[in-house]
């Protein structure tokens, strides 16, 4: 049997509103609706012990409200390109990138193009193409199943065999593509985390 615990009040769209004011307004509306729903449920004689929600893009807003007593942020652990596009204000936490895809240049067909061995099977693109990490001379342009095409600046020094790091556009479905996460600190592999839920449907 099930025991009623509370209300799920997650606002998914607000996680990706770019401006702080947009997120603040959206979550203020969520808090008002959550309070109204709690009052209605408790008026009917059912205790609401928990109001849960929030995400990486708005966790400080729900967490500092007097309405939510549980938050569900998850992407902040790894971060991705899409969340990094959110503008922050002084109250927001500065989460760092911790998820990278290592790929290498397999082909250099022209001065302005290169092909890497990381495509759709390596990175989810539902929230945009990966970001080439810490490089201003390369832009990940498009992906096929096995490969990605880079657009290079005329002075790019990248050549065959060079390795680069990518930040996925969306961390959640990207992690689901792998069996393991290789955990590196500096030049040392400190752990290998199995992704036990990969492919799990239930």
Residue locations for each model-derived region?
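Solvent-exposed alpha-helices and their adjacent loops that cap or buttress functional pockets
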Residues: 1, 43-45, 63-64, 97, ...
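Active-site loop/helix belt of alpha/beta enzymes
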Residues: 1-88
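Generic, ordered loop/turn and secondary-structure boundary motif
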Residues: 3, 11, 78-79, 102, ...
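Active-site loop ensemble at the mouth of alpha/beta enzyme cores that anchors a bound cofactor
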Residues: 23-26, 58-136
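Conserved active-site and cofactor/substrate-binding residues in soluble primary-metabolism enzymes
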Residues: 29-32, 36, 46, 96-100, ...
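C-terminal accessory subdomain/extension
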Residues: 109-202
